[in-house]
Amino acid sequence: MVQVNENEYRLKFFLNNNYNRKICQVCQTPFWTKDKERNVCADIPCTDYYFFDLNIKSPPLTVREARQKFLKFFEKKGHTIIPPKPVLARWREDLYLTIASIVDFQPFVTSGIVPPPANPLVLSQPCIRLEDVDNVGVTFGRHLTTFEMAAHHAFNYPDKQIYWKDETVELSKEFFVEEIGIPEEELNYKESWWEGGGNAGPSFEVTVGGLELATLVFMQYEIKDGNYVPLKLKIVDTGYGVERIAWFTQKTPTAFHAIYGNLVYTFFNKIGAPLVDDELLKTAAILAGRIDPDKPETIKRHREEVAKKLGLDLKYVDQELTRAARVFQVLDHTKTIALMLADGLVPSNSGEGYLGRLLIRRALRVLRLLGSDIKLYELVKEQIEYWKEDFPQLLKNKDYILDVVNLEQERFNETLSKISLTASSLSRRKEISVDDLVKLYDSNGIPPDLLVEEIRKINPEIKVEVPYNFYGLVAKRHQTVPLKDTKKEKLPKDVIDLAENLPPTKKLYYEDQYKRSFTAKVVSVYKNYLVLDQTTFYPEGGGQIGDTGIIKDEKGNTYQVVDTQKVKDVIFHILDKEPSLKEGDEVYGEIDWQRRYRIMKHHTVTHVILSAARKVLGEHVWQAGAEKTPQKGRLDITHYKLPTEEEIKKIEDLANYIINDRRSVRPLIINRTEAEMKYGVSIYAGGVPEGADVRLIEIKDWDIEGCGGTHLSNTSEIGALKIINVEKIQDGVIRLEYVAGDVVAQYARQEEDKLKEISRQLSTSPEQIEVRLKRFLEEYKEKEELLNQYRKMMLQEIENISKKETVNGVTIYIINLFDEELRKEAMRKLTMNQKSIVVNISNKGNNNVVEIATSNDLRVDKIIEALRREGGKGGGKGTYGSITTQLNVDKIVNTIKSTINNGI
């Protein structure tokens, strides 16, 4: 821990209430307690869990009851209850998951840019942390992938103090003593230090009976160049473990029994795993503080201690606790999976989707280890039913959640079918490092223990070990958003540097999005880059391309604006040539209105389509990218499979309904905190803008999201919409391309021209294409059937009609078949006998294409190499190869014979 002045922790509250500062005899950490005899900090591993033996006044509390008791207590103490945010941190551009309650307020509230939604406030925030995923179950409840962090926060400004350390500690004491009924002498405040996100401060860990029930952090420093600089905004950042409070009051054998109640027994039953004795579990839990997950040997030692204490066989204890831990892992993981999917996660091979897929696959792997063939979605369904009142989004998105989990299980099974092939390719190595295993999992998703098992069947000597915390290592690599590559700037560096010393450009396009022309004064001229004091030219941003148009000077010179770009708040007009202008000159500007108007249509319709897609496909749909040009619009959305034609029609019809319904479209400038509280984090579908205020585009009773682009004032101006292309561009991302307004007519004409050309090729009219095509396909089918009959006849005679020769005990068949399907079947049939080679030679221009197939007991490698030495190009290995050569047929055959004579 950082060396901190003792006065940071020497609070008036402690001194006035007869608390003593002690040094733990085990860990040497200072802590505060009213118990004068206490010499140990009451935290694991300094002690075992002994809260089971403490007498408290509170009745057993479920998770829901513990949550409500906490919220209501702090509401009585003047805190405003605010709703939690989703478990996907979409208001953050650097983080995928909500890992703590303070994340809800980062970066804008904590940096002082915007005020908090209330001050002080209280909430219970569901959180997900995956770096300790391998420890879940093994520690019987100390580690969970999903948990609720109940928290009260106070934001202290220089001119407005709410409360600080003394009040925070006193509130915790009152909650634990008055609401939970813990004897005050059992409370311990362990001195600690917190750092995260560039901030730091002293903290207290509240420990009782071996269990850490809360952490009280006082965020008061900013870390700059390794130094601690006092913050102007000082934040009380607390975290109370809701699940731990429930366990503390229920005193169940493990935390999982307290969190999940009867669902524990349901899971054992459905998985087909025999129940584990409660006394064994409770003893294991009491001693679980001795487990250090970073030291796997402590797990073995823990089980030895449990066996000794109960007088049981170690093998039996190990077997029982392993089974229990695995069932608890499935319990934990399925809840986390349900919460992730309910908040809109789409499993994929990147981003937040990667973390979701990792957890699904880990749950599936654990089920295999338990020998269970139950479908994972059946267990997730149980979680939805159990938690539906606490998290209504689970029930609302139930169909999506179950559909995705089922699909992911199918994909996982497909992945496992490739394990032998992957193992074979890796078995030639002498060693596989942990980093290699992580990279392999990233690329193919095969559980490392299964992969290593297969590799060792082929190469028992290979050096490879799967670390105990493998999945945690993988999760850690993916838990934060990688730093985005520096955007490929469209402006040269000298122009970007120029912007540093220029004033912001007034944005006339926000005052009136229909404004076509304007007058302005020149602020800067550099080469063909022009900066004005104000402009109606929209600079490229948010997927909308920059405006073009003209600029005229007072002398009558006209300059074409070929592009518009922005550096921070300075707008650059890129001209077709260097202008004869100087600072202070007045100019006239006019945008290419037809072009801009088409872009506006494609931009507004993008918002219409996104909302339509969410309504048709589900609330998990999120914008993954977009582009708006005069020619068309493009929207990339998160979705787990390619939409059906019926779904695309529904999206298109719904969007056209909104267009024809003449919905008003208006921009709103609103405080960020107010916007989030009123509309939720979906306002960030197009990205997270900076600043205290956000600009929203509202389509009446349809859609509202943050956007800095130019828009129509009514959906009717869009005219019409046609989706022209739908494709899967990457795992979990679907691309929609569409046209709007008068571009729809252009697109229709192009399609009409294609139809006319097709009808011309079929010698019929456009009206008769369907009839003609049907007849054509029937004729094609008849001819295909006839061709198949000829193929069968040829195959029956292939051995007789091919040139056959025996060389060095090997039978060589020389054939010349142009029909690809017939050729493949012939080569397969002729190589069924041992020691046989088939050579198909076909002419292609000035070259001969040679295909070679061998029976399973021979290889083509040497033959291919011999033909390559003669100038051939191609390759092959095993039983098949192909090469292109200028050799004539006789020379090809002789080269092959010679190679066989020398032995292949």
Swiss-Prot record:
Keyword Zinc: yes
Cofactor needs: Zn(2+)
GO cellular component: cytoplasm
Highest taxon listed in the record's lineage: Archaea
InterPro entries cross-referenced by the UniProt entry: aa-tRNA-synth_II/BPL/LPL, Ala-tRNA-lgiase_IIc, Ala-tRNA-ligase_IIc_anticod-bd, Ala-tRNA-synth_IIc_core, Ala-tRNA-synth_IIc_N, Ala-tRNA_lgiase_arc, Ala-tRNA_ligase, Thr/Ala-tRNA-synth_IIc_edit
Enzyme class: ligase
Pfam families (alphabetical): tRNA-synt_2c (PF01411), tRNA_SAD (PF07973)
Catalysed transformations (reactions): tRNA(Ala) + L-alanine + ATP = L-alanyl-tRNA(Ala) + AMP + diphosphate
Record note on cofactor: Binds 1 zinc ion per subunit.
GO molecular function annotation: alanine-tRNA ligase activity; aminoacyl-tRNA deacylase activity; ATP binding; tRNA binding; zinc ion binding
UniProt record similarity statement: Belongs to the class-II aminoacyl-tRNA synthetase family.
Comment text on domains: Consists of three domains; the N-terminal catalytic domain, the editing domain and the C-terminal C-Ala domain. The editing domain removes incorrectly charged amino acids, while the C-Ala domain, along with tRNA(Ala), serves as a bridge to cooperatively bring together the editing and aminoacylation centers thus stimulating deacylation of misacylated tRNAs.
Function of the protein: Catalyzes the attachment of alanine to tRNA(Ala) in a two-step reaction: alanine is first activated by ATP to form Ala-AMP and then transferred to the acceptor end of tRNA(Ala). Also edits incorrectly charged Ser-tRNA(Ala) and Gly-tRNA(Ala) via its editing domain.
Protein name in the entry: Alanine--tRNA ligase
Source organism of the structure: Sulfurisphaera tokodaii (strain DSM 16993 / JCM 10545 / NBRC 100140 / 7) (Sulfolobus tokodaii)
Lineage per the UniProt record: Archaea, Thermoproteota, Thermoprotei, Sulfolobales, Sulfolobaceae
